[in-house]
A protein has these predicted regions:
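Primarily recognizes the serine-hydrolase "nucleophile elbow" in alpha/beta-hydrolase
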Residues: 132-200
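Alpha/beta-hydrolase
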Residues: 83, 189, 263-266
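Short amphipathic alpha-helix adjacent to the substrate-entry channel of hydrolases
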Residues: 92-112
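The feature captures the conserved acid-bearing segment of alpha/beta-hydrolase catalytic domains
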Residues: 177-180, 184-203, 210-248
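Short beta-strand element of the alpha/beta-hydrolase
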Residues: 74-86
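Hydrophobic beta-strand anchors of alpha/beta hydrolase catalytic cores
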Residues: 80-82, 110, 230
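N-terminal cap/lid segment of alpha/beta-hydrolase-fold proteins
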Residues: 12-72
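C-terminal catalytic histidine-bearing segment of alpha/beta-hydrolase fold enzymes
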Residues: 243, 247, 254-302
Length: 302
């Protein structure tokens, strides 16, 4: 469903985009993420809070690939950089460490970066922080067993937006040592690709401080299709607007979008859980983008 021709009411935008209000069990889900993430950090080999910049928010957590994973002995591991959600104003990298264990076990180096939060900074500032984070990962991945030529970015919700933005980055303009294809692929889960509607959602707009111009400038759907590949997934039980957002990026970027699927039986929050569930379609897409799907087949619809 697309929005009516006349701009809907503020209440309509809040209903479509305020996912915590739409999901009564959101507190239990957030607690599950926190508990599972604490367990992951306790069990995995890790290097935590590594600076990628000078600001205190510019830190990342690194989880090296398991030696028994799907990478040949002595070979460098593909790198998965995962960006947390929270509408650019909430949550922390530590809330989503739980996605790391199955990818580490499969042979990937997993990196979770932090960034500053709105309203202290704007979304454009956050995008540039993540650009610096990815540049750091490219330059230092080998120190942790990672292959800098095989970087994939995943993200949930606002993190899905940031993952798509990183695909569009002109890396050679950032620094001469960075390759044009620094990010080879991205997996966006419940991403936001058109930011204009967020300007009209009272629960969110004051923190984001978007203008019509900045919303368009920061909307992946209105940027040229990148060289890298995108998989865009959304929960089938999400709001009509999130389903529209997912269809929009597929239409805008065309063949660069490998899939723009709705995951059955999942809403905006529990759709992320699938990333950490081996055998799920979402996890299989992650493996395939990393080159770790040994079956080398498109994930099934189930």
């Amino acid at each position: 469903m697309t929005p009516p021709k006349r701009r809907p009411s503020s209440a309509w935008f809040d209903d479509q985009y305020n996912n915590r209000a739409r999901i009564p069990e959101h507190l239990a889900i957030l607690q599950h993420w926190a508990d599972a993430s604490a367990q992951a950090r306790a069990q995995l080999t890790s290097v935590l809070d590594v600076p990628y910049g000078s600001d205190p928010s510019e830190r990342l957590d690194i989880f090296p690939a398991a030696p028994t994973g799907g990478v040949a002995a002595g070979a460098l591991a593909p790198v998965l950089v995962h960006i947390h959600g929270g509408y650019w104003r909430a949550l922390d990298k530590r809330d989503q460490s739980f996605i790391a264990p199955p990818f580490v076990a499969a042979g990937a180096l997993v990196v979770l970066p932090n960034h500053a939060l709105c309203p202290a900074v704007g979304i454009e500032h956050i995008v540039m922080q993540l650009v610096r984070a990815l540049a750091w990962v490219y330059r230092h991945a080998a120190e942790y067993g990672g292959d800098a030529s095989r970087i994939v970015v995943s993200g949930h919700s606002a993190g899905g937006h940031l993952a798509a933005m990183l695909l569009t980055c002109e890396w050679c303009a950032v620094a001469p040592d960075l390759p044009a294809g620094l990010v080879g692929a991205a997996l966006s889960i419940s991403g936001v690709f058109d930011l204009e509607p967020l300007r009209h959602a009272p629960f969110l707009a004051p923190d984001l401080k978007l203008t019509a111009a900045s919303a368009r400038r920061l909307s992946p759907a209105f940027l040229p299709a990148p060289r890298g590949r995108l998989v865009a997934l959304v929960g089938a039980d999400e709001s009509a607007e999130f389903l529209r957002q997912n269809a929009l990026i597929a239409s805008a970027w065309g063949p660069q979008v490998l899939a723009s699927d709705a995951v059955p039986g999942r809403h905006h929050m529990d759709v992320l859980n699938e990333l950490a569930e081996p055998g799920s379609r979402t996890h299989r897409w992650g493996l395939q983008l990393l080159g770790l799907d040994l079956l080398d087949a498109k994930p099934s619809a189930g």
